Amino acid sequence: MNTKETTSTQKLAIAGVLTAAAVAGSLISVPVVGSKCAPVQHMVNVFAAVMLGPWWGIGIAFCASLIRNLLGIGSLLAFPGSMVGALCCGLVFRLTRKLSLTCVAEALGTGILGGLAAYPVAKLLMGLAPAGFTVYMIPFFISTFTGSVLAFILLRVFEKSQVFLAARR
């Protein structure tokens, strides 16, 4: 097995673990303004950005959202929130390599862009009549802010203990 295959296998294994963590973590949720706010998904988005990059992060967010929906423990609103946030924080980490900016990008990407993207999903795919275009921004922001703070704290602790040293290369 060559190095490229080993790296791909390692990334796939990490993606599987992060997807499982996001699905299991979705059981820890708080209902806020008609949506399930699960901060663990947003923590996973930041972990994926740091360890794997934006495209893997989007894939993890999609798979976790799909699995949660198939298990009946999620809603279609999980897709725009988690995937937009994963893209934003993944791109910011790739460009800056700064954890603080990555966490801010996750919070703003999910809270604002994901919240806005959730409106047409709710209206067109779920048949809901949301009160306004920005109705999902506050609950999404509450969830993503909490998850981003958790990710920041945990990654700083892991960084000091050198847990993610090999994964960040």
What are these regions (language model features)?
Residues M1-R169:
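Loop-helix junctions at membrane interfaces
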